[in-house]
């Protein structure tokens, strides 16, 4: 994320077309995944045969998995990715973002329902959930991540938590972040 951010990409408001401040922070989840995946491929940091975005689920092809790594149809990894951006580009709280992480309702396509979807999807390889987001002094990610882990444990078995920090981002609001991931197992 840091190397993509260093190029100062500019996202635009979906409704007005107005540009946001430079940086990876204001980009949509899909755009961020695309930008970071392309950067990892360019740098050679993906040490596998390949990857593909938006891969149909084996058992429900109308649903798409955010990222599959390896060679299809027997992917090494199927990964659902969710963004946790608690503040908007304007510095105001994003009031409904926790729904995208914690909602138990499939219609919300949350991180929580992504776990159960992955566990029952029919992928032959391993499955994982990745949550990336931005840290703010008054809105740290840890309480939301811990809440996710507690809720997810009701539906699936989570592997060990992996995480890394993202620092010195160029956006004036989305200045730093964290990336979390867990391997997902059916209960």
Task: Please annotate each region the language model reported.
Residues 1-42:
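Interdomain/boundary linker segments immediately adjacent to catalytic/signaling cores
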Residues 119-147:
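Nucleic-acid nuclease catalytic cores
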Residues 136-187:
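Non-catalytic C-terminal interaction segments of nucleic acid-processing enzymes
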Residues 98-113:
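A short acidic, glycine-rich active-site loop
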Residues 38, 116-120:
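Surface-exposed alpha-helical segments enriched in charged/polar residues
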Residues 67-69, 73-99, 118:
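Conserved catalytic cores of phosphodiester-cleaving nucleases, focusing on short active-site segments
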Residues 40-68:
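A short acidic/basic microdomain associated with nuclease active sites
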Residues 61-63, 111-114:
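Amphipathic coiled-coil/heptad-repeat helices and related helical stalk/stem segments
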